């Protein structure tokens, strides 16, 4: 059974509980409710193209929007899909290969994502390194 079908049962159960709790505040469900209502923007951490494609499939099934994929070293492989879905990539300029899932990057990753679908792509350069962030203008 595909994983999204397994989650479907959980989603139905959560939806049922939300209906029962109308008028009550269920703090543990506030974030999920915010995502489903569009109030919370989803910033998803993924390295690999297959992970991003799976998350896009889940977002369509459960009707929520992914705003950006962070790190996304394989975003160039699905750049057109990201552009079609209006999903940005918050990408490293030149930091990859430090672990298995961050191995398959190309130096043109940012450019490919940004120029997908004749410039309709969305790519921003970021760093989560305290030294690297100070020198992004050199990358």
Regions found by a protein language model. Name each.
Residues 28, 51, 75, 106-109:
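Amphipathic coiled-coil/heptad-repeat helices and related helical stalk/stem segments
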Residues 49-53, 72-79, 131-133:
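Active-site environment of divalent metal-dependent phosphoester hydrolases
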Residues 1-68:
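Polyanionic/metal-chelating signatures
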């Amino acid at each position: 059974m595909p994983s999204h079908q397994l989650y479907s049962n959980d989603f139905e159960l959560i939806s049922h509980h939300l209906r029962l709790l109308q008028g009550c505040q269920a703090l543990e469900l506030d974030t999920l409710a915010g995502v489903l209502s569009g109030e919370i923007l989803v910033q998803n951490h993924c390295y690999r193209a297959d992970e991003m494609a799976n998350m896009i499939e889940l977002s369509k099934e459960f009707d929520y929007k992914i705003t950006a994929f962070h790190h996304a070293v394989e975003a160039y492989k699905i750049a057109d899909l990201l552009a079609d879905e209006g999903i940005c990539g918050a990408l490293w300029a030149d930091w990859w290969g430090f672990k298995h899932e961050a191995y398959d990057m190309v130096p043109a990753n940012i450019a490919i994502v940004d120029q997908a679908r004749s410039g309709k792509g969305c790519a921003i350069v970021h760093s989560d390194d305290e030294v690297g962030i100070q020198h992004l203008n050199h990358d």
